[in-house]
Amino acid sequence: AVEGAKIAAADMGANLGFGALLRSYRFDKYRTKEPKEKKPLLKALKVLCPTSAKAKATFADMEKVADGVFFTRDLVSEPANVLYPATLAKEAQALKKLGVKVTVLGEKEMAKLGMGALLGVGQGSARESKMVIMEWTGVPKSKAAKAQQPVAFVGKGVTFDTGGISIKPSAGMEDMKWDM
């Protein structure tokens, strides 16, 4: 525990482990051989706190978040010839096994829905645009859960955005895949 801290020791321990776990990420899918000075990997971290059972339970939830962070980092680390709208949609479809409802719209469906602005972004691409809608209704509904208002997150998953290329500087253009 840190004297004067406004966070419980168990939460502090779990957050320390979570930070170390996030820091351990490494995208080396395309690495052909390890460099001479191989990046050190954290093999173990022991955090002592007075309520270790609570810290372990909190960290278990954080580990699931880290899995999602690593999945996202893997996606944005892929080059544009590997991750494009159809492959991103396929990756999203794989989340069905976790209870996520996934709907993928193609260009025809988007046109019928009047999504001209979105279609305009992708019209210069050789690949078809996709709209991926993911819905997760959570754990089985309790009375308390049913009384809560739904929460919606809206984001974009543009796999490579060179939009406005005439006004963007060329330096860093390769990083436009991080626009997700």
Regions found by a protein language model. Give the residues of each.
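Short amphipathic alpha-helical segment within the helicase RecA-like ATPase core
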Residues: 1-157, 162, 170, 175
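Gly/Ser-rich catalytic serine loop of serine hydrolases
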Residues: 177-180
